Amino acid sequence: MGSKKDSNFLEKIAKRKFPYIIAEIGINHNGNLNLAKKMILSAKKSGANCVKFQSFVADKLISKYAPKANYQKKYKKTQLELIKSCELKTESLRKLKNFAKNKNIEFLCTPFEIKSLKDLIKIGIPAIKISSDNINNTPFLIEVSRTKLPVLLSTG
């Protein structure tokens, strides 16, 4: 749950004289932990203050009948299979968080549903980033509010 330390996350950003740069890694690691670590190192080397990943359970978000986006059509897998291959399990997220901490770069992760939110709370995140597609998801936002963590809210 939220703590004084967690509220310092937003204070730390607000009191800066320079922009706070969050490197969006998202799912570009393709489910590969080593690639994700290389991306963290690249973000750090580029001057980012923070890296941000995405956490989700594909089966809870995507129908097995969902059509593929244009860029996905070259693959034989379904959209669900493609996105599922980018999932990071809780233990992988914990490893990435610890790796980022050891490299002195902040770790954030956007949860897309309640299970992912609860998993991120278990590994200890300083804030919750809400994606714009969840901005009207009242049950999810209620769960987020119960964490008492600072929230970064995308609007589009």
Residue ranges and their predicted role:
Residues 1-23:
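N-terminal amphipathic alpha-helix/helix-capping segment at the start of soluble metabolic enzymes
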Residues 38-56, 123-124:
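Catalytic domains of carbohydrate-active enzymes, especially glycoside hydrolases
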